[in-house]
Amino acid sequence: MAKNIQAIRGMNDYLPGETAIWQRIEGTLKNVLGSYGYSEIRLPIVEQTPLFKRAIGEVTDVVEKEMYTFEDLNGDSLTLRPEGTAGCVRAGIEHGLLYNQEQRLWYIGPMFRHERPQKGRYRQFHQLGCEVFGLQGPDIDAELIMLTARWWRALGISEHVTLELNSIGSLEARANYRDALVAFLEQHKEKLDEDCKRRMYTNPLRVLDSKNPEVQALLNDAPALGDYLDEESREHFAGLCKLLESAGIAYTVNQRLVRGLDYYNRTVFEWVTNSLGSQGTVCAGGRYDGLVEQLGGRATPAVGFAMGLERLVLLVQAVNPEFKADPIVDIYLVASGADTQSAAMALAERLRDELQGVKLMTNHGGGNFKKQFARADKWGARVAVVLGESEVTNGTAVVKDLRSGEQTAVAQDSVAAHLRTLLG
């Protein structure tokens, strides 16, 4: 017997029972995006490798250790996208969407990183990202955060996420802070773990992200990034905080929040939760005013974020049990008798025409009434429409409310109207 081929470790199948809840959550997210005037952009999952090296940074963990990179048949180095911002910027430059224009874009789809798989962290994972181009004030930063807060309210998880904010300033301010931080770390090198020693010279701000308790204790005495901010970044951050306070959005300033990708400047933020164990970041982003120019476009202010959908689904399921998947089927059409199947299928097509958006399944494979009603129950139907030989002859159908058990004989021409009343 041939050996079964299984999914690659860290790349998961999502089965019908799971995709139903994903679809409802995604529908909620998309409705909110539409209410803010954001437009979808669809991007390739494979890009040229230099795009990510230039955008993310050569000495980041993502580029050094996590990218799925391969050579194609033409000898070109290609990479499965590890994040969405770089590809969105590339598309904006390539298609002339950015220069002297405002764009509010969103995308959704799989990303790929070669990490150690664990709950909430996978090698193929899904993100929804938003990117805004052409606006440089703190007001658009605030709008993005307000948009995410509206998502949490719609999903019933507001009480389980908290907002952390920071400003990492301009490139020049960050360079000055980098020098001060390296000088401090060199004085305490013996207290650093091997990972932090490596990062100290390649990407020292990432030491602030260390999960090592001893390093965290050491960092209490480290120089504060806020003390090195340029005046323009201070004013920008103060403006953002004031707007969030006016909107009633609570936040905590976390001066160790730096983000893991090199392209960020000024505003950075994360929505975090205590309900998912170690994988606490649900949504994160910030401003990246230099990235468009860095990738070959003209200087364009930009800000955005990405949200991990696997973690969001886990969080919704953990803290909001009332958030259920929509039923697969609203109506199940039961047909019994030698000559009823063609009539049942014709009625089903007519009902689909008249009841837009209603999910109707016709019984196939025969079976007595008991078996067919069991199938209706399995698919979550609220109503059964029953056709037997006598109903076909009389031009009627029996409509049965599967919750109350009440049933009514209705002329076939009136079935759609009766169903509208039952389904609300």
UniProtKB/Swiss-Prot annotation:
Stored CDD domains: HisRS-like_core, HisRS_anticodon
Catalysis performed (reactions): tRNA(His) + L-histidine + ATP = L-histidyl-tRNA(His) + AMP + diphosphate + H(+)
SUPFAM superfamilies: Class II aaRS ABD-related (SSF52954), Class II aaRS and biotin synthetases (SSF55681)
Keyword Aminoacyl-tRNA synthetase applies: yes
EC number from the UniProt entry: 6.1.1.21
One term under GO cellular component: cytoplasm
Keyword check for Aminoacyl-tRNA synthetase: yes
Domain of life (superkingdom): Bacteria
Keywords from the UniProt entry: Aminoacyl-tRNA synthetase, ATP-binding, Cytoplasm, Ligase, Nucleotide-binding, Protein biosynthesis
Entry's localization field: Cytoplasm
Gene Ontology MF terms in the entry: ATP binding; histidine-tRNA ligase activity
Any one GO BP annotation for this protein: histidyl-tRNA aminoacylation
Name of one Pfam family that matches: tRNA-synt_His
Broadest EC class assigned to this enzyme: ligase
Subunit structure: Homodimer.
Protein family (similarity comment): Belongs to the class-II aminoacyl-tRNA synthetase family.
Protein name: Histidine--tRNA ligase
Source organism of this protein record: Shigella boydii serotype 4 (strain Sb227)
